[in-house]
A protein has these predicted regions:
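Conserved C-terminal "switch" segment of AAA+ ATPases
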Residues: 1-69, 95-99, 103, 124, ...
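C-terminal engagement/docking regions of AAA+ P-loop ATPases
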Residues: 61-145
Length: 145
């Protein structure tokens, strides 16, 4: 049994806190800014950008071409979702040693970029639909053209 406030603080500190990690910088601020500039120079082919545009707009419920979105989605992705897929695709391409964004990069980033950017309606919840399965289905209908 702890005999004093100091003893109790010592016990709590030793048993409820992790070890203090030693963190040392790997890159500095100017290097990060340079990396951001490099990422933005990676080209995106017109057909890849068009796919991102179609995918983003296909999440909008007012899009009459996509009955899935109008049935289950209350709010679709904003332009930020498209920006995230493009910039993420550029980073992914560089990390893979490529100098251009592929449709595969966009498909790999689609769920992390868009799942939290679409709001489902009550019908989707009642039917057990999730953002991930709806996005996969929407992307499947778009194909990769």
């Amino acid at each position: 049994m702890a005999s004093s406030s100091a003893d109790l603080h010592d016990i709590l500190d030793r048993t409820t806190q992790g070890t203090v990690a030693v963190v040392s910088p790997v890159v500095n601020g100017p290097q990060i800014l340079d990396m951001r500039k490099v990422v933005r120079t990676v080209p995106v082919a017109p057909h890849v950008q068009e796919y991102v545009v179609k995918l983003t707009l296909a999440t909008h419920p007012e899009n009459r071409e996509n009955l899935l979105a109008s049935k289950y989605i209350r709010y679709g992705s904003s332009p930020r979702g498209a920006q995230t897929m493009i910039l993420g695709g550029k980073v992914r391409a560089l990390l893979d040693g490529r100098f251009n964004v592929s449709l595969e990069d966009i498909r790999a980033l689609m769920l992390p970029a868009l799942r939290h950017r679409i709001i489902l309606n009550f019908e989707a919840q009642a039917d057990g639909r999730t953002p991930d399965d709806l996005l996969d289905e929407i992307a499947g209908k778009l194909g990769t053209n």
